[in-house]
């Protein structure tokens, strides 16, 4: 049988990851086409039922803020994954996006050193993919 890990809100954690992506993409006030593509590509890879998909499409129309996303983590591992999902959704080229990632890391209680490691990993993956 399939056991899906749960977020702190009792929903499947994979939904929390997409909510983090949506929230980060909206940090500058709108979800751009590249950000939307990343989010939809991620949703397409998940094995979601119709209710879960509807939940996520509602989340796109009413994105959560960093505080709401911070409340979804059960422990440091999930917190790190939520931060990384948010970071994957955006290219933080706007001060509001950078501020969002900082606020999210603080709310999730992800240590600065771990954030730096995750950021380095992201940059290495982007370099390898280029």
Named regions from a protein language model:
Residues 1-22, 34-130:
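Small-residue-enriched hydrophobic alpha-helices in membranes
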Residues 29:
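Acidic, glycine-anchored loop motifs typical of Ca2+
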């Amino acid at each position: 049988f399939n056991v899906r890990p749960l977020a702190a809100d009792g929903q499947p954690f994979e939904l929390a990851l997409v909510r983090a992506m949506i929230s980060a993409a909206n940090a500058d006030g709108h979800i751009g086409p590249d950000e939307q593509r990343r989010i939809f590509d991620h949703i397409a890879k998940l094995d979601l039922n119709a209710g879960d998909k509807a939940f996520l499409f509602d989340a796109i129309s009413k994105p959560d803020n960093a505080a709401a996303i911070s409340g979804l983590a059960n422990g440091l591992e999930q917190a790190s994954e939520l931060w990384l999902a948010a970071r994957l959704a955006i290219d933080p080229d706007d001060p509001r996006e950078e501020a969002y990632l900082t606020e999210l890391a603080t709310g999730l209680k992800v240590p600065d050193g771990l954030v730096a490691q995750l950021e380095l990993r992201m940059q290495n993956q982007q370099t390898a993919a280029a």
